[in-house]
Amino acid sequence: MVKSSLQRILNSHCFAREKEGNKSTIMPAVLSLSTGQSSSRVPFNCCSNLGPGPRWCSDVPHPPLKIPGGRGNSQRDHNLSANLFYSDNRLNVTEELTSNNRTRILNVQSRLTDAKHISWRAVLNNNNLYIEIPSGALPEGSKDSFAVLLEFAEEQLQVDHVFICFHKNRDDRAALLRTFSFLGFEIVRPGHPLVPKRPDACFMAYTFERDSSEEE
């Protein structure tokens, strides 16, 4: 279970980064994934190279992908309304309405204190949750917020896999790879059916191990 590993990420230095330039979001590419692909316990055949970065993370720049009819520059489309998806004393999750009723765009806001909130953007697709690690310096408390998000994915969404994605040319890529590998995430091989074709992005996956009694 991911709970037993959460403390590892709480001490990670990857959540205190230097400021980076703006980069295009990866999430629009996730929306283009086929919803018919089975996701249950899929092997990822991950790469084991945790040096400067996997060879498949090419340095060739790629143009940003856009949601058809959308802005594609990390700004929310104002024509999309949002509905409350889930709420408790730590999380408030809203869902952006899309034309695809099998893919959900979730805006997750964690409440660390009454005055401090941290937001994450995720896509729920075919029992998998995709979370983009944003560029730039993350605010203080992001490590605790991410831990709460993982618990939400396991206990409330009951997904099979959690994917994280981040741009391969960020300065802290090697640190991110080490941190999430230690947490239990695996590097996803290129061309895997559960991730979009984005050679400019790195994807890692965590598979939840459930008892047979929980799956019945």
From Swiss-Prot:
Gene Ontology process terms (BP): positive regulation of protein catabolic process; viral translational frameshifting
PANTHER family for the chain: ORNITHINE DECARBOXYLASE ANTIZYME, ORNITHINE DECARBOXYLASE ANTIZYME 1
Pfam families: ODC_AZ
Cellular-component GO terms for this entry: cytoplasm; nucleus
Function: Ornithine decarboxylase (ODC) antizyme protein that negatively regulates ODC activity and intracellular polyamine biosynthesis and uptake in response to increased intracellular polyamine levels. Binds to ODC monomers, inhibiting the assembly of the functional ODC homodimer, and targets the monomers for ubiquitin-independent proteolytic destruction by the 26S proteasome.
Protein name: Ornithine decarboxylase antizyme 1
Family indicated by similarity: Belongs to the ODC antizyme family.
Record text on subunit structure and interactions: Interacts with ODC1 and thereby sterically blocks ODC homodimerization.
Record InterPro entries: Acyl_CoA_acyltransferase (IPR016181), ODC_AZ (IPR002993), ODC_AZ_sf (IPR038581)
Species, as recorded: Gallus gallus
